Structure formats: structure tokens, C-alpha cells
Regions:
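N-terminal Rossmann-like dinucleotide-binding module
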Residues: 1-45
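Rossmann-fold dehydrogenase core element
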Residues: 104-121, 142-147
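Beta-loop-alpha module in the N-terminal Rossmann-like domain of NAD(P)-dependent dehydrogenases
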Residues: 16, 48-108
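Short active-site oxyanion
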Residues: 26-30, 64-66, 166
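Predominantly a Rossmann-like dinucleotide-binding segment in NAD(P)-dependent oxidoreductases
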Residues: 122-169
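Acidic-histidine catalytic/liganding microenvironments
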Residues: 23-24, 60-61, 125
Length: 169
């Protein structure tokens, strides 16, 4: 059993939490968000323990890995803390909006030899999976070229835009 702490409970964080719950090899031990009411609400939905400071998860020796799905501006700070406690890390994209900060983070964490993955693919996107299934079944024909336009089904809120990972800046 791999014990996980989920940090950040926005749209993508909740999606990761639900996906983790579906896998019998993972236990979502903690959930955290800067919004305490949201933390409590989502902890009930995901049958997890609410925490109100990420350091609780970092210091817990039972936690094997952290999923960082908080706002982009918090990613590096959380990663730097997680590596000190030898946690495996999954971090949503982007790591940061500033290449110098990213390079500095890389230098700082290398001495810890961390297990870290950035969520930068659409491998499990339902639309992509459906396309693959249809191709395998031969319903589409011979594949020659794919051009993809990727977007959410609805525009994001103004509140989200203020802390988004830079796609709208």
C-alpha cells in the first residue's frame, strides 16, 4: 500500500484524488488546500484526513508520496520541502513560470536524488483514449496524421485565471 498526501484541491487535484481512490494500491491518507472549508469538504468526499498545513504530510513517515496540484506559484516551495523528507513527488504542470526558478529548483533537489514526475501529458485523456480505441477497431481508417486542439469544455473562471499556470497570461 502506497500512502499519498494530495496537496491542492482544485479541479485537477480532485481529479487526481478520485483517480487515486480507484487504485487499490494507493491510500489517500491526507488532503490539503489553502481553503480550509474546501479541505474539509473534499476530505469527506475522498474519505481522507484533512490537514491544514502541508508539513503534517511531509513529516509523517507513513507518507510515501505527495501529489502537488496546488497553484503554480506554490509548486517549487512544496517540492523543496518534500525532497527534504524523501517523499516521492508527482507535481502538476507547470513547475513554475520562470525558467531561472526551475533551474534553481533542479540544482537544489539533485542532491536528494528525488523520485519526481511532472504531469505533462494527455495520455489518459478520455478523448485520446476513445480515438485510440476507434483506430484499433478499424472504424476510422488508416491513420496518416493527427492534429489536436486541446481545451477544456468551458471557459475558466476569473478566479482560476488569476492563479493558473500561465496558459492565459
Amino acid at each position: 500500500m502506497i500512502n499519498i498526501a494530495l496537496l491542492g484541491l482544485g479541479r485537477i487535484g480532485v481529479m487526481h484524488g478520485k483517480n487515486l481512490m480507484r487504485n487499490k494500491d494507493f491510500k489517500l491518507k491526507y488532503v490539503y488546500d489553502i481553503n480550509k472549508k474546501l479541505t474539509l469538504k473534499i476530505s469527506k468526499e475522498l474519505k481522507s484526513n484533512p490537514i491544514y498545513n502541508p508539513s503534517v504530510a511531509f513529516k509523517d513517515r507513513e507518507i510515501d508520496a505527495v501529489f502537488i496540484a496546488s497553484t503554480t506559484s506554490t509548486h517549487i516551495k512544496l517540492i523543496l520541502e518534500a525532497v527534504k523528507y524523501k517523499k516521492a513527488i508527482f507535481c502538476e504542470k507547470p513547475l513554475d513560470l520562470n525558467i531561472n526558478k526551475i533551474n534553481n529548483c533542479k540544482k537544489k533537489i539533485n542532491k536528494f536524488n528525488p523520485k519526481i514526475q511532472l504531469g505533462f501529458n494527455r495520455r489518459y485523456d478520455p478523448g485520446h483514449n476513445n480515438l485510440k480505441k476507434e483506430l484499433i477497431k478499424g472504424r476510422i481508417g488508416k491513420l496518416e496524421k493527427i492534429i489536436i486542439t486541446s481545451r477544456d469544455p468551458a471557459p475558466p473562471s476569473i478566479k482560476y485565471l488569476k492563479v493558473s499556470g500561465g496558459i492565459f497570461k
